[in-house]
Amino acid sequence: MADKPDISEVSQFDKTKLKKTETQEKNTLPTKETIEQEKQCEA
C-alpha cells in the first residue's frame, strides 16, 4: 500500500448511483433509573 491514497476512484464516483434510504431512530441506552427498576423487579 502506498502512503498517499488513490484519489482516481474517488473522482470517478457517481452520486446518482446511490439509493435513497430511510433513516431509522437508533436504540438509546436505558437510564440508570430504568436499570434500577428492572433489577428490583427481578429480585
UniProtKB/Swiss-Prot annotation:
Q: Which GO terms describe its molecular function?
A: actin monomer binding
Q: Report the protein's function.
A: Plays an important role in the organization of the cytoskeleton. Binds to and sequesters actin monomers (G actin) and therefore inhibits actin polymerization.
Organism for this UniProt entry: Cyprinus carpio (Common carp)
Q: Where is this region: Disordered?
A: 1-43
* One of the GO biological process terms: actin filament organization
Pfam families, per database record: Thymosin
Q: Where is the signal peptide?
A: none
User: Where does it reside?
Assistant: Cytoplasm, Cytoskeleton
**Per the record's keyword annotation, is Metal-binding included, yes or no?**
no
Keywords noted in UniProt: Actin-binding, Cytoplasm, Cytoskeleton
| Family of the protein in this entry | Belongs to the thymosin beta family.
What is the name of the protein in this document? Thymosin beta-b
GO cellular component assignments: cytoplasm; cytoskeleton
Q: Which InterPro entries match?
A: Beta-thymosin (IPR001152), Beta-thymosin_sf (IPR038386)
Q: Where is the composition biased (Basic and acidic residues)?
A: 1-25, 33-43
